[in-house]
Amino acid sequence: MKYDVVVVGSGVAGPIVARDVAKAGFSVLLVDKKPAIGTPKQCAEGINVNVFKEFDIPYDKRFINREIYGARIYSPSGYTAELRYDKVSGVILERKVFDKMLAYYAAKAGADVWARTEVIDLLRKEGKIMGVKAKHEGELVEIEAKIIVAADGVESTVARLAGINTYAPPHEFDSAYEYEMIIEGYDPDLIHLWFGNEIAPRGYVWVFPKDEDRANVGIGINSDNEKTAKYYLDKWLKENNIPTKKILEINVGLVPVGGFVRELVKENVAVVGDAARQVNPVHGGGMYEAMKAANILAKWIVKALEEENLELLKNYTKEWWEVEGPKMERLLKLRRAMEKLTDEDIDVFVQLLGGTDLEKLAGGNYFEVVKALMKHPKVLMSKRRLEILKALL
């Protein structure tokens, strides 16, 4: 069988590529190795509300658990900073439904969709990549394609088979552990984030409300830590007297927080999303970045097919680095600075930060925030804090 494009992986990036290319009239096959697209989830499920309009996704209550109005962060000593809007700023998704619906939208646009289909090798003829070999419901199939998209996650098989260098050292990954559980006592209109070296080394604990008394409660820490993410999460729950006898779901995962893939295309294979390490280095969220990259990639796939010139595919790398690269590099720089903070530093900065500051930091636009902080006596008194901030400018 033959297709113009085979997209491997049906998270958030893959279906958007498949949908947009199919809309342009080209034949597309979207495959995913899981028998049920969207499971298991490996995500806190929070996303900015603007993505629906930006990426032409229906605002469908079937996959929206809760609308969110802001965020509250907590320092090691209990100081807080809050960002609260008068209108909805984000939503907590039901990823099992959301991912499946993205695949549905791709199918409605004209793409074929196969679940329980695992790519095991690339199809090569005379040294050229001509498609993929896959196990589809247990049977070996060969699928020819002009372009192959590796959207198959952090351990991308397709990228490795194509020879795309996705290597990153262990330090560039976070280990995440999450409970979906019954929990009370936290404002369900906000997401909640706790920082501290004893709480979550290099990361944070989160509570993302899915209902009035149900939330994703998780943690991300450096993956090369000698203790596990589960250890730190259970410790935090115990210290905060939060019962752990009403756990509805457990999810674990490895999150890339650096090591961006430099060359996103090799021959006729393009890598996108977690497979390309396109994840916000500060908070570890990858849905928006995956969608943005998928949007750019789909545009260049369509142009390459329309003009019958696969060399145009390389413009995906160029455009992503021009549009998203500078922001991602700034966020990585911010993360490196955050890694040097002591708990006392975190206490000081949380006390000094306002809601507008939090918004700028989350978006990577931290220059104004840093300059303002550097003038504060509590920062000027500390040579180390001053040096950390100076390194960001």
Curated annotation (Swiss-Prot):
Record field: catalytic activity: a 2,3-bis-O-phytanyl-sn-glycerol 1-phospholipid + 8 A = a 2,3-bis-O-(geranylgeranyl)-sn-glycerol 1-phospholipid + 8 AH2; 2,3-bis-O-(phytanyl)-sn-glycerol 1-phosphate + 8 A = 2,3-bis-O-(geranylgeranyl)-sn-glycerol 1-phosphate + 8 AH2; CDP-2,3-bis-O-(geranylgeranyl)-sn-glycerol + 8 AH2 = CDP-2,3-bis-O-(phytanyl)-sn-glycerol + 8 A; archaetidylserine + 8 AH2 = 2,3-bis-O-phytanyl-sn-glycero-3-phospho-L-serine + 8 A
Keyword entries, A-Z: FAD, Flavoprotein, Lipid biosynthesis, Lipid metabolism, Oxidoreductase, Phospholipid biosynthesis, Phospholipid metabolism
Cofactor(s) needed for function: FAD
Record-listed E.C. numbers: 1.3.-.-
Any single GO CC term annotated in Swiss-Prot or TrEMBL for this entry: membrane
Pfam families in the cross-refs: FAD_oxidored, GGR_cat
Further information: Reduction reaction proceeds via syn addition of hydrogen for double bonds.
Annotated protein name in UniProt: Digeranylgeranylglycerophospholipid reductase
Provenance organism: Pyrococcus furiosus (strain ATCC 43587 / DSM 3638 / JCM 8422 / Vc1)
